[in-house]
Regions:
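Central cavity-lining transmembrane alpha-helices of secondary-active solute carriers
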Residues: 79-99, 307-320
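C-terminal ends and interior cores of transmembrane alpha-helices
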Residues: 115-128, 338-354
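Conserved MFS/SLC helix-loop-helix module at the cytosolic interface between two early adjacent transmembrane helices
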Residues: 92-128, 327-330
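Extracytoplasmic gate region of multi-pass secondary transporters
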Residues: 53-55, 264-317, 407-411
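Glycine-rich segments within core transmembrane alpha-helices of 12-TM secondary carriers
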Residues: 144, 161-189, 205-206, 399-411
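Extracellular/periplasmic helix-loop-helix junction of adjacent transmembrane segments
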Residues: 56-91, 300
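Cytosolic juxtamembrane N-terminal segment immediately preceding the first transmembrane helix
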Residues: 1-55
Length: 479
């Protein structure tokens, strides 16, 4: 035991010297400029990896299920949705993977994540069957959920410029997805069977950016400062702190959080609102099928729509941020949910009635920006601001679970319906899930959920929105 402690101390002493040297190294005055350029390109790769398979859903199902297996499109899409559930257990590994960056640093995982996103894109480019495709797609899905480029942006910016820098890079990344329709026009030439080639260019960008990050990005000062402080802390003191943290965390836990949430008005209605809201989540993943099979848009028309998709997405993402800062969380969720509802209705009707692909594209982009603007606010902010400190982490997990459960439920419903309804009706089916979900969320947020902006998170108890209990006891004398 003593030898193990000595080895640990010796290893940490070497690491401490290395970390202090890294922290003391001076950066040139242009470092942040080229770092943010690298991060923006990595973010573009991340955004493309997040959305490209959604945008090529029709092509993927047609090749792997309709042509290779001889299935009808609806049955093929249903099976494709079922196969997607296989990746769920792998995604759960993020719980163990993500904390590694707190021990080994941000830079190694910025490089690894970017490299693996590029590798996933490249595997899909090479895929000839659904099995190879799923390997590449699952690898992409796992890595995009880590968002190490976001951590870099936040930790390399000061408090005054943090929000601005993040907003700028995020907007650039969304607009960078214009690369996909550009590649559809040039390399793919709007030929459905050539969809694989579109994956090649962002894969190459991912590989190059991983190399650039390895050569030119430095470890963040925020991590180095925290790690050095940890290494300088005696082992016994660390053990005592860990014990105290475990005792504090023992007050939490998902079951305790669920029981607490259902006992208190604010969290109870936030959960109900989320159940409705996430029922509409399939609208974010099925617009390719709606355009190709329900609206019967050609590859050229879909490409034109996708040129306007990032514009609508970026515009409504910025609007969401402005509304949140100006008017608060509740108004943001209601306003952006209304916007998402209007945009999705416009998307479906614009496509089905052949108005113009440009309007169809900006409408679905507006839906995506509005929907996730509301979703990030309700899940990422309001759950946290409505929970006491000792349960906050556990309560936010409820939102993640609701997203998976309701999204999975909606997927199962469509898996049953897709093989038996005409392709022309797919758009109306997704509309039938999206509209009631958003309307329900809007009504519940408007009537039953309180505002949380401006609350001191250190003093929130979660009971602030509970109605005072009425004393119904009566004396024998009457009133």
């Amino acid at each position: 035991m003593a030898k193990n402690v000595e080895r640990l101390q010796a290893r940490e002493a070497k690491e401490l010297i290395r970390r202090e040297k890294q922290l003391g190294a001076r950066s040139n005055k242009f470092y942040l400029i080229y770092l943010f350029m690298i991060l923006a390109l990595i973010y573009i790769t991340d955004e493309i990896a997040s959305t490209i398979s959604i945008q090529f859903q029709t092509n993927i199902v047609t090749e792997f299920f309709v042509k290779n297996m001889g299935m009808e499109y609806g049955a093929g899409l249903s099976l494709f949705s079922a196969i997607g559930f296989i990746s769920y257990p792998i995604t759960l590994l993020i719980v163990f993977y993500r904390p590694l960056a707190d021990k080994f640093g941000r830079k190694p995982f910025l490089v690894i994540n970017t490299l693996c996103m590029g590798l996933g894109l490249f595997i899909v480019y090479l895929s000839k069957d659904i099995y190879t495709y799923m390997i590449g797609s699952t690898l992409m899905g796992f890595m995009v959920s880590h968002d190490m480029q976001c951590v870099y942006i936040l930790e390399c910016s000061n408090e005054k410029t943090r929000a601005r820098n993040y907003a700028i890079v995020k907007a650039v990344a969304i607009l960078g997805t214009l690369l996909v329709p550009l590649l559809r026009t040039t390399l793919m030439q709007n030929v459905s069977e050539r969809w694989h080639v579109v994956y090649l260019v962002p894969a190459i960008i991912g590989f190059v950016m991983a190399l650039f990050a390895l050569l030119f990005a430095k470890e963040t000062n925020a991590f180095l400062t925290k790690r050095i402080e940890y290494l300088k802390t005696p082992i016994k003191e660390r053990e005592q702190r860990s014990k105290e943290e475990r005792e504090q965390n023992a007050q939490g836990g998902i079951l305790t959080a669920v029981k607490f949430a259902f006992k208190h008005r604010q969290l109870r209605f936030l959960i109900i609102a989320c159940c409705c809201f996430y029922l509409a989540s399939l609208g974010t993943a099925t617009y390719s099928t709606v355009m190709a099979k329900s609206a019967l848009m050609t590859e050229e028309e879909i490409t034109l729509a996708l040129f306007l998709y990032p514009v609508g997405n970026a515009l409504f993402t910025l609007i969401s941020g402005f509304v949140s800062d100006k008017f608060g969380r509740k108004i943001t969720i209601i306003a952006m949910s209304c916007s998402a509802l209007a945009c999705y209705l416009l998307f479906v009707f614009s496509g089905m009635f052949k108005w113009t692909p440009y309007l169809t594209g900006i409408a679905i982009g507006g839906f995506m920006g509005s929907y996730w603007g509301a979703g990030d606010t309700i899940g990422g902010i309001m759950f946290s601001e409505s929970s006491p400190t000792n349960l906050r982490s556990s309560v936010t997990v409820i939102n993640t679970l609701l997203n998976g459960i309701m999204g999975g439920l909606a997927t199962i419903i469509t898996m049953i319906l897709l093989p038996i309804i005409p392709e022309k009706m797919f758009g109306y089916m997704y509309l039938g899930l999206t509209v009631p979900g958003l309307v329900g969320a809007i009504i519940i947020m408007w009537l039953f959920v309180g505002e949380t902006r401006g609350l001191d998170l250190k003093t929130v108890t979660g009971t602030e929105w509970d109605k005072p209990k009425k004393n119904k006891e009566k004396t024998q004398d009457g009133k």
